Regions:
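Conserved alpha/beta cores of soluble small-molecule-handling proteins
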Residues: 1-189, 193-194, 222, 227, ...
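Glycine- and Gly-Pro-enriched alpha-helical subdomains that act as flexible
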Residues: 189, 196-218, 223
């Protein structure tokens, strides 16, 4: 089976230095407290960012989303967006990285005085971790495409846990991924509470029919940066794109389909 996140292994990753709260640690010594909110509860937000030719792609959009998500869960990040950007660039510079790099920026609510969910039990500033890795997607994934299947696990409504949030709690997507893998497919095509196609477990879904592009309304999927860029490119080039509800039956009559993501870029669906 393939995956939208298949990558070429790189020996240099064994020696990377990871940023944790302003300090750098070798990969094999980088760690956080067992009382950290992210570890105990999945309480936090994150973003995946790419470094290409020494430039962080769409960094302003990534940091805006991160901050918007943090505000939505009442998490106040003590570093400004500019300070976070500088920290990421510093991390890539210390690692002498220039391109083909994927960066995971993680912000948890911080350390707890005891393992309990109430944010009032947090006794530290938010934990900020920056993990940079040399990561090039597998070429065969782009050539062969990936296979999708619908699953029983759905994207929940906003009043359960807002599916637009890019939170550390990814169990909903993990369960969908497990279902898809157990069925011998590469990734899950997830529905919303109304039975419409919403998104995939780790990428965003688009299909093409009669030279028109379709994607979901965005109500039940993470606010994808690459997804929005594809939408913008379509509009700029006068390609008709519909953000609307649609069913599996609509997908099955599509001329072609693809998925998008920061790491995945654009991958065809078989």
């Amino acid at each position: 089976m393939s995956s939208s996140h298949d990558y070429i292994k790189d020996k240099r990753n064994a020696n990377i230095k990871i940023y944790i709260n302003g300090y750098f640690y070798p990969r094999n010594k980088a760690s956080i407290s067992v009382f950290d909110s992210g570890f105990l509860l999945g309480d936090g937000v994150w973003s995946g960012i790419r470094l290409h030719n020494q430039k962080l792609l769409f960094i302003k959009e990534h940091l805006k989303r991160l901050n918007d998500d943090a505000k939505q869960i009442g998490l106040k990040i003590h570093l400004s967006k500019k300070e976070l950007e500088k920290a990421i660039y510093k991390t890539t510079k210390i690692n002498k990285m220039k391109s083909d790099v994927h960066i995971r920026l993680v912000v948890s609510r911080g350390i707890k005085s005891t393992p309990y969910q109430d944010p009032a039990f947090t006794i530290s500033k938010p934990t900020i971790v920056i993990i940079p890795e040399y990561k090039k997607p597998q070429e065969k994934t782009y050539k062969q495409g990936i296979k999708l299947t619908t699953v029983k696990t759905i994207r929940g409504p906003e009043n359960v846990q807002d599916p637009k949030l890019n939170s550390l709690s990814k169990l909903n997507c993990i369960l969908a991924c497990i279902e898809a893998k157990n069925k011998k497919f590469d990734e899950a095509l997830m529905k919303d509470p109304n039975g419409n196609i919403a998104t995939c477990n780790s990428t965003h879904f688009f299909y093409i029919k009669n030279k028109k592009v379709y994607t979901s309304t965005g109500k039940y999927c993470v606010r994808g940066i690459t997804r929005q860029n594809v939408i913008n490119i379509c509009k700029k080039n006068k390609i008709i794109i519909h953000q609307k509800n649609f069913k599996l039956s609509d997908v099955l009559t599509a001329d072609e389909a693809f998925v998008t993501g920061t790491f995945a870029n654009i991958i065809p669906v078989k």
